């Protein structure tokens, strides 16, 4: 089967690799976003998908290079459109490409354009399904393959695969799991499409939810929210959630909402840390206030409902550090308040 692959971030890499190593598929070209400049050094950096495509001839001992195209705006790029039309292609595979494909491109392949989406559609259509799924405290997510149309993840569904979400899973953890699942599901989808063993199912638009692009203000931690809500925000928008500490920004990159109802889900090493904690049943404070510090564990902050253990934080210009190292390095004391410009 002849394929053109559209994709950009690390999430798309496992699917591309599975296509490249499978002799049943011939990847004719890879289309990815243009190289971007890094903040440090202003150096142009290729996408993860481009890196894989450019190294393909080396790790497969192939005599020819895999063509990589990087249109700035594919909707208006007539050269790319004409190139695609010239190919005798069976299917387009699209995984987190980053640009909307117009109908004139979607219509080119014989079997259609297949998208690998990181949610159980029709829930969490849009650009950030993994992040908002975690933010909302979902305990399960998955991958949906679909035939693309011009809408935002509105095409007819082909196959689905689900996976549980652990209480400590962050956006990177879930993305890594889903990227592998997505690659396997895509191969199965293409096989069934080719054999006409799959019936596309229209989405129920009334049941659809949306996962919009994350904005800078979404990263701010509001300590009046519950410990569980803050924990879900921290892991969903990992590693960017931010508060203030002594009038400077402080990222919180890992946390845990204290409460007996959650402890049976925890790995042994975290269980041991929690066993060191004193009785917290009579401890309280104002939202954001550090109400307890335990040696070898770290600081606990009051929230609008419940207590939040700060497992990992990051000060400006520093690397992430454990909650206990943060306490030691800053000489944090009980009674200090996070947030509100403190």
Curated annotation (Swiss-Prot):
Which protein family is it in?
Answer: Belongs to the Fmt family.
For this protein, the parts annotated as crossing the membrane are none
Cite the EC number: 2.1.2.9
Fetch the Gene3D superfamilies from UniProt: Formyl transferase, C-terminal domain, Formyl transferase, N-terminal domain
- Stated role: Attaches a formyl group to the free amino group of methionyl-tRNA(fMet). The formyl group appears to play a dual role in the initiator identity of N-formylmethionyl-tRNA by promoting its recognition by IF2 and preventing the misappropriation of this tRNA by the elongation apparatus.
What catalytic activity is recorded?
L-methionyl-tRNA(fMet) + (6R)-10-formyltetrahydrofolate = N-formyl-L-methionyl-tRNA(fMet) + (6S)-5,6,7,8-tetrahydrofolate + H(+)
> Which CDD domains does the UniProt entry name for this protein?
FMT_core_Met-tRNA-FMT_N, Met_tRNA_FMT_C
The identity of this protein, by name, is Methionyl-tRNA formyltransferase
The answer to whether UniProt assigns keyword Transport to this entry is no
Keywords recorded for this protein, A-Z: Protein biosynthesis, Transferase
Residue spans making up a coiled coil are none
- InterPro entries of this UniProt entry? Fmt, Formyl_trans_C, Formyl_trans_C_sf, Formyl_transf_N, Formyl_transf_N_sf, Formyl_transferase-like_C_sf, GART_AS, Met-tRNA-FMT_C
Where on this chain does (6S)-5,6,7,8-tetrahydrofolate bind? Answer: 119-122
> Is ATP-binding tagged as a keyword?
no
Protein source organism: Nostoc sp. (strain PCC 7120 / SAG 25.82 / UTEX 2576)
GO MF entries? methionyl-tRNA formyltransferase activity
Look up the record and report any one GO term of the cellular component aspect.
cytosol
């Amino acid at each position: 089967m002849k394929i053109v692959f559209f994709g950009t971030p690390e999430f798309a890499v496992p699917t591309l690799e599975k296509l490249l190593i499978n002799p049943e598929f011939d990847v004719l070209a890879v289309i990815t976003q243009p190289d971007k400049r890094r903040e440090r050094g202003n150096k142009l950096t290729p996408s993860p998908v481009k890196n894989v495509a450019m190294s393909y001839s080396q790790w497969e001992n192939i005599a020819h290079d895999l063509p990589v195209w990087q249109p700035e705006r594919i909707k208006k790029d007539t050269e790319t459109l004409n190139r695609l039309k010239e190919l005798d292609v069976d299917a387009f595979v699209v995984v987190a490409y980053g640009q909307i494909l117009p109908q004139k491109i979607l219509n080119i392949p014989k079997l259609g354009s297949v998208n690998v989406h990181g949610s159980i559609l029709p829930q969490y259509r849009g650009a950030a399904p993994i992040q908002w799924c975690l933010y909302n405290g979902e305990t399960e997510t998955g991958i949906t393959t679909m035939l693309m149309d011009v809408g935002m993840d509105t095409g007819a569904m082909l196959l689905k695969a689900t996976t549980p979400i652990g209480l400590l899973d962050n956006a990177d953890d879930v993305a890594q799991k889903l990227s592998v699942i997505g690659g396997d599901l895509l191969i199965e989808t293409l096989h069934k499409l080719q054999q006409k063993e799959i019936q596309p199912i229209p989405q129920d638009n009334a049941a659809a939810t949306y996962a919009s692009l994350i904005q800078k203000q979404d990263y701010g931690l509001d300590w009046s929210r519950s410990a569980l809500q803050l924990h879900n925000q921290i892991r969903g928008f990992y590693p960017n959630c931010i508060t203030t500490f002594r009038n400077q920004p402080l990222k919180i990159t890992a946390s845990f909402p204290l409460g007996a109802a959650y402890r049976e889900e925890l790995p042994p090493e975290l269980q041991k840390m929690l066993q060191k904690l004193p009785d917290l049943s009579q401890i309280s404070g104002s939202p954001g206030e550090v109400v307890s510090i335990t040696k070898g564990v770290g600081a606990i902050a009051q929230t609008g409902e419940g207590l939040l253990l700060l497992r990992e934080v990051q000060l400006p210009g520093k690397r992430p550090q454990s909650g206990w190292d943060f306490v030691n390095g800053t000489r944090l004391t009980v009674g200090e308040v996070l947030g509100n410009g403190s």
